[in-house]
Amino acid sequence: MIRAFALLFAAIAMLAGAGHAQAQNLFQPFFEDTRDIMGGGPGFFRPGMPSGSSPIPRTTVNFAGNFAPGTIYIDTAERRLYLVLGNGQAIRYGIGVGRDGFRWSGTHRVTAKKEWPSWTPPAQMLRRRPDLPRHMVGGIDNPLGARAIYLGSTLYRIHGSNEPETIGQAVSSGCFRMTNEDVTDLYSRVRIGTPVIVRN
């Protein structure tokens, strides 16, 4: 009798475990999605979140450049952004860069940082693309994505994107695109005044 109860208990435990695994697999894609049901919002992305949606994974690499720790170094030809850590290392991120005719180089500093920024396309862009909205509030569908880091007095930014598949491509109007996960990580590591060096 006791043995029968033990076998029954073991069978129930196995079924419960299988049911739990199936439920976990069923809901896993929902919880791994980078959007929430309200369309994103401040605080949804966490610094240090894995960059699973980037075609170019974020990683720490050896870095030979002679720049102070904390410097952002952007290599547009390589389509990579480096945050210099010091001791010969940097965090390397994949980026999208300006298409032909929109790439640039120079040295600036971070002058502003915004979470879930709104977007107002500049007049030149509206002339090229009259179909664009005149203004878009921040959110998961906004082209600037989860974070924006403003460079000097230019219109250029390092920002997130609602098109993570474009990371590694030359498709922007001069800004540097990152996945929302990666730009959130970078945003948490830099401050106003951080030097930004852009090289073609």
Predicted features along the sequence, with ranges:
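N-terminal pre-domains immediately preceding structured catalytic cores
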Residues: 2-200
